[in-house]
């Protein structure tokens, strides 16, 4: 069976584990920078193009700072994510704020930072006016309804999604915003998740470019930018084909020229990729602590769904490598589990793998997006550390593991003698 490549080998990882006990997520700085540069190059034809990293994917200030240094802005959807941006010096048009069901304090904070706000609903116009005020630059999120297709393939059903303005609401919303003094408008849409079809962005782009042109003519406003949002997926399985980002950029260019050629419209293109940017650069490293043989063969690890929720929540596939046994026959079938009191706490089900022994190191791939960030504390489980594998091969702890003291910190009234014994 084809295995996925790793930026480290067993001997290197054993040295890392001496410094940072498992489980932990480790991120490959070199790969993150490479992906940011490839994306920027793919859209270099568009003057003013900018990627706004989806902070929700991996809300770590060190990872965010790496992407900031590569020219990326930040896409936020919550108060805490705005706080992270401010902490690393990303403010103003370095932030897009795309939220829904938005609390007043979030809008007010976004306005204080002068972030570019992407409105999710026509009723939010009046709400924002009352809580933060209407800026001169603003964006609106479009939901076309119906089915979203690429060719004959159905990629999603936007009509069921809770996000965005209808087409009629866009026209009315732009008119209201124009009357309130908005000078520069943006258009945004997100219609598919984890899509590896190279025609996803070009298809979405044609839809948005066409609507932008219509709005420009109907309302008489400047469409300053069009945000293709996120949605580009990654190859979770070894046999999956990765998105060809250079091809994608070239196809979006073709659509841009097709729709805007012969007009004076030259909107900037924005993207809000998260998974594509950091997903393949992250790995959950865990140690085998138990082996159980009943009706099935179970391998118990020191990690659990609290460290990586996607397999339990979505049934998502994440590739597993047994370090040091990459070339061994995959002649055993295992369920890889954690210790939560939930039967779905499994990283892999009926997975062909080499023979696994207690003490083996397992690497679970593609956890650099929606991995640590979706962690939780059910069953009293603690979130793991995060480690950066730097370009020079050294490592840096970029988030310590949670402690029981952290877990119980909100019980201000409770005296727990055991905590006094823990460091």
What are these regions (language model features)?
Residues 64, 87-88, 107-109, 128-132, ...:
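Short acidic, glycine/serine/threonine-rich loops at helix termini
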């Amino acid at each position: 069976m084809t295995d996925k490549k790793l930026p480290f080998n067993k001997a290197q990882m054993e040295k890392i584990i001496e410094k940072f006990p498992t489980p932990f997520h480790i991120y490959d700085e070199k790969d993150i920078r490479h992906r940011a540069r490839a994306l920027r190059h793919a859209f270099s034809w568009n003057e003013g193009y900018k990627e706004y990293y989806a902070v929700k994917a991996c809300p770590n200030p060190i990872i965010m700072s790496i992407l900031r240094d590569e020219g990326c802005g930040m896409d936020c959807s919550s108060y805490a994510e705005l706080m992270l941006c401010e902490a690393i010096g990303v403010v103003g048009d370095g932030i897009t704020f795309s939220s829904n069901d938005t609390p007043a304090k979030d809008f007010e904070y976004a306005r204080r930072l002068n972030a570019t706000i992407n409105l999710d609903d026509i009723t939010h116009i009046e709400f924002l006016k009352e809580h933060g005020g209407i800026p001169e630059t603003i964006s609106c999120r479009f939901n076309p309804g119906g089915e979203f297709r690429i060719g004959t393939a159905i990629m999603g059903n936007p009509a069921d999604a809770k996000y965005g303005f209808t087409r009629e609401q866009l026209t009315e919303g732009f008119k209201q915003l124009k009357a309130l003094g908005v000078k520069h408008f943006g258009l945004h849409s997100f219609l598919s998740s984890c899509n590896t079809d190279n025609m996803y962005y070009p298809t979405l782009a044609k839809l948005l470019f066409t609507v932008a042109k219509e709005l420009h003519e109907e309302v008489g406003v400047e469409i300053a930018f069009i945000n293709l949002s996120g949605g580009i997926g990654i190859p979770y399985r070894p046999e999956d084909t990765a998105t060809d980002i250079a091809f994608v950029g070239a196809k979006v260019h073709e659509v841009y020229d097709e729709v805007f050629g012969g007009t004076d419209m030259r909107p900037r293109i924005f993207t809000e990729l998260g998974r594509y940017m950091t997903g393949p650069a992250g790995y959950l490293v865990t140690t085998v602590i138990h082996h159980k043989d009943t009706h099935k063969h179970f391998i118990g690890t020191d990690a659990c769904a609290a460290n990586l929720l996607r397999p339990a929540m979505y049934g998502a596939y994440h590739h597993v490598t047994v370090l040091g046994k990459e070339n061994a026959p995959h002649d055993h079938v295992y369920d890889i589990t954690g210790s939560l009191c939930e039967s779905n706490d499994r990283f892999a089900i009926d997975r062909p793998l080499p023979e696994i022994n207690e003490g083996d190191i397992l690497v679970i791939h593609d956890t650099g997006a929606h991995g640590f960030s979706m962690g939780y504390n059910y069953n009293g489980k603690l979130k793991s550390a995060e480690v950066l594998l730097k370009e020079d091969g050294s490592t840096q702890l970029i988030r310590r593991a949670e402690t029981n003291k952290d877990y119980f910190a909100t019980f201000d009234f409770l005296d727990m003698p055991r905590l006094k014994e823990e460091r």
